[in-house]
Amino acid sequence: MNGGLCLCVLMAVLAAGTLAQPVPPADSAVPGAQEEEAHRRQLRAVQKVDGESRAHLGALLARYIQQARKAPSGRVSMIKNLQSLDPSHRISDRDYMGWMDFGRRSAEEYEYTS
C-alpha cells in the first residue's frame, strides 16, 4: 500500500516538473539557427578551459608515471615471494595444527556400520 502511494506521488511530482518547464519557441523562419547557437555554446565552453588546469593535469600525470616506474608491480613482487617459499611451507595465518580440512578427508578414516 505504502509502495503504491509513494509511486503515485513520485509520478505526480515528475509530471508536474515536466509541465512546469518552459516550451521552446518554434522559430520556423530560421530552422538552422538553434543548431548554430548550440554549436557556438559548445565552442565557448571549450574555450573556457584554462591552460593552467591543463598544466596541473600534466603535472599530476607526470607524478603518477614517476611513481609507477619506481614502485614494483604487485604481480612481480608476488611471484618473487612465491618462488622464495618452500613447497612444504605452511601458511601460518590459515593452517592450524589440529584443525581438520573437511574437504580433504578420505573415506578410509570413517568406520561405517553396515
Swiss-Prot record:
The keyword Signal applies. The modification Phenylalanine amide is found at residue 102. It is found in: Secreted. InterPro entries: CCK-like, Gastrin/CCK, Gastrin/cholecystokinin_CS. Its main location: secreted. One of its GO terms (molecular function) is neuropeptide hormone activity. GO terms for biological process: axonogenesis; cholecystokinin signaling pathway; digestion; eating behavior; neuron migration. Synthesized in both cerebral cortex and duodenal mucosa. The precursor is cleaved by proteases to produce a number of active cholecystokinins. Brain contains CCK-octapeptide (CCK8) and several CCK-desoctapeptides; whereas pig gut contains intact CCK33, CCK39, and CCK58 as well as CCK-octapeptide and the CCK-desoctapeptides. Distribution differences are due to tissue-specific post-translational processing events. Keywords: Amidation, Cleavage on pair of basic residues, Hormone, Secreted, Signal, Sulfation. The modification Sulfotyrosine is found at residues 96, 110, 112. Residues 1-20 form the signal peptide. One of its GO terms (cellular component) is extracellular region. Residues 106-114 form a propeptide. Binds to CCK-A receptors in the pancreas and CCK-B receptors in the brain. Belongs to the gastrin/cholecystokinin family. This peptide hormone induces gall bladder contraction and the release of pancreatic enzymes in the gut. Its function in the brain is not clear. Binding to CCK-A receptors stimulates amylase release from the pancreas, binding to CCK-B receptors stimulates gastric acid secretion. PANTHER family: CHOLECYSTOKININ. This is Cholecystokinin. It comes from Sus scrofa (Pig).
